[in-house]
């Protein structure tokens, strides 16, 4: 039986889609975006449809669902999503929507179930999404095989769970193979989330990412972070000093000896992995630069691994140190509202209060996240002004922002079915 609705109300966003494409084609790539990209709810809806519903997103970590029936849930725009560990250890992802009358199946953020049971009318699903029970009153012609949960594309690599709401998402396997290699020393199946926070920022999601993609603001805003973080992006950073390059050379020799991957690996503008030293004499992103967890990750023996930085557009950045990892994900709520989730991961056998102290582990990035929240919110308030007009980026300090917006512009035009504008290459790309 075909239950798909044939009613079409048309696309009320069509005029806004055309205007969006026109603005992207004509924008100066060395300047910030026109005001509607940060303020307009219609453009936000287009962002959700063409970016967050079509690209690969990090849903969580495999260690968060270690056993059969463990699940986690998340919200992508209007779409509730369920990620669950199957009977044979597979990771499945589904729309968290019962096929009976549409109720959410799982309402908690995390949990464990034997079967997926809708709380409304107790329709019951296997962990692989098959409908097992729908009561006894659905009629003789009811075919349970037609009413399994709607699946979502899912891939795993290096302990990360990637999902896409698209039927045909962009290619990502080359990046995932590299990520798997770079994450091997961490043995992420034997990790755990020590603590997780979510903050709400009164700013457009792109402002949150733009702020992350540069450290032009760091000296004036992030005293805690700069106790350990070197501002330079990598040795190709136009600001990089010879002393920094010498430090990188010394560190890479030690990393090679321990078979720790470190080389810069890029996959277009969407993905990047690189290991960079921390400030000389520090080994972890803590207030004193000492280990945040006494028990090191995976097979790691030397805590002095700097920070392996992982970028995944549109919404994630990561710092992987010898003793713990920090995973950041950005989730748009509205045109001027964004959630930022931060997860600190340690070895699964590390004992709270013995091997690590949660307050100490999170102290640097609690402060940094709050500082970045204020910066993004003030940026948003200014952009809302009638006086706002796009301003120029520094190719020396803000090339990461330029790269992000070039990626965003190209993906938007591509997903809107428009010809992409020429993307200029800049230092650090």
UniProtKB/Swiss-Prot annotation:
Fe cation binds at residues 217, 222. It comes from the Bacteria. PANTHER family: CHOLINE MONOOXYGENASE, CHLOROPLASTIC. Binds 1 [2Fe-2S] cluster per subunit. Binds 1 Fe cation per subunit. It catalyses: glycine betaine + NADH + O2 + H(+) = N,N-dimethylglycine + formaldehyde + NAD(+) + H2O. Gene3D superfamilies: Naphthalene 1,2-dioxygenase Alpha Subunit, Chain A, domain 1 (3.90.380.10), Rieske [2Fe-2S] iron-sulphur domain (2.102.10.10). Induction: Transcriptionally regulated by GbdR. Expression is induced by growth on glycine betaine or dimethylglycine, but not by growth on pyruvate or sarcosine. Involved in degradation of glycine betaine. Part of a Rieske-type oxygenase system that catalyzes the conversion of glycine betaine (GB) to dimethylglycine (DMG). This subunit is the terminal oxygenase component of the system. GO terms for molecular function: 2 iron, 2 sulfur cluster binding; iron ion binding; monooxygenase activity. It comes from Pseudomonas aeruginosa (strain UCBPP-PA14). Its EC number is 1.14.13.251. Belongs to the bacterial ring-hydroxylating dioxygenase alpha subunit family. Disruption phenotype: Mutant is unable to grow on choline or glycine betaine as a sole carbon source, but it can grow on dimethylglycine. The gbcA-gbcB double mutant cannot grow on choline or glycine betaine as a sole carbon or nitrogen source, but it can grow in minimal medium with glucose or pyruvate as the sole carbon source. Keywords: 2Fe-2S, Iron, Iron-sulfur, Metal-binding, Monooxygenase, NAD, Oxidoreductase. The system is composed of an oxygenase subunit (GbcA) and a reductase subunit (GbcB). Its cofactor is [2Fe-2S] cluster; Fe cation. [2Fe-2S] cluster binds at residues 98, 100, 118, 121. Residues 56-163 form the Rieske domain. The lineage of its organism: Bacteria, Pseudomonadati, Pseudomonadota, Gammaproteobacteria, Pseudomonadales. The keyword Ion transport does not apply. The keyword Lipid metabolism does not apply. This is Glycine betaine monooxygenase oxygenase subunit.
């Amino acid at each position: 039986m075909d239950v798909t609705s044939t009613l079409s109300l048309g696309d009320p966003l069509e005029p806004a889609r055309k205007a969006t494409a026109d603005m992207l084609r004509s924008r100066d790539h060395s300047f910030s975006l026109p005001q509607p990209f940060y303020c307009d709810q219609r453009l936000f809806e287009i962002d959700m449809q063409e970016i967050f519903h079509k690209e690969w997103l990090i849903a969580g970590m495999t260690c968060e669902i270690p056993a059969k029936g463990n699940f986690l849930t998340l919200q992508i725009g209007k779409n509730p999503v369920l990620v669950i560990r199957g009977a044979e250890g597979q990771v499945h992802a589904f729309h968290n929507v019962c096929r009976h009358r549409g109720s959410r199946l799982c309402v908690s953020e995390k949990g464990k179930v034997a079967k997926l049971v809708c709380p409304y009318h107790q329709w019951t699903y296997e962990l692989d999404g098959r409908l097992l029970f729908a009561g006894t009153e659905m009629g003789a012609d009811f075919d349970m095989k037609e009413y399994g949960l709607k699946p979502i594309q899912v891939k795993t690599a290096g302990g990360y769970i990637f999902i896409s709401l698209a039927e045909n998402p962009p290619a990502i396997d080359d990046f995932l193979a590299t990520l798997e290699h770079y994450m091997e020393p961490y043995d992420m199946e034997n990790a755990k989330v020590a603590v997780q926070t979510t903050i709400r920022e009164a700013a457009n999601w792109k402002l949150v990412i733009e702020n992350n993609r540069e450290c032009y603001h760091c000296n004036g805003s992030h005293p805690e972070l700069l106790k350990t973080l070197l501002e330079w992006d990598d040795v190709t950073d136009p600001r990089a000093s010879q002393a920094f390059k010498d430090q990188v050379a010394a560190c890479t020799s030690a990393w090679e000896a321990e078979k720790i991957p470190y080389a810069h690996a890029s996959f277009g503008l969407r993905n990047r992995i690189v290991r960079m030293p921390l400030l000389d004499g520090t080994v972890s992103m803590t207030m004193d630069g000492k280990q945040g967890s006494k028990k090191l990750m995976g097979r790691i023996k030397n805590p002095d691994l700097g920070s392996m930085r992982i970028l995944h557009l549109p919404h994630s950045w990561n710092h992987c140190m010898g003793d713990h990892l920090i995973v950041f994900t950005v989730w748009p709520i509205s045109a001027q509202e964004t959630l930022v989730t931060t997860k600190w991961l340690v070895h699964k056998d590390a004992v709270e209060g013995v091997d690590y102290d949660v307050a100490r582990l999170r102290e640097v990035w609690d402060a940094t996240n709050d500082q970045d929240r204020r910066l993004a919110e003030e940026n948003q308030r200014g952009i809302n002004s009638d006086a706002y007009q796009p301003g120029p980026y520094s190719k020396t300090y803000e090339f990461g922002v330029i790269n992000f917006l070039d990626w965003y512009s190209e993906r938007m035009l591509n997903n809107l079915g428009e010809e992409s504008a020429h993307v200029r290459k800049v230092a650090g790309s």
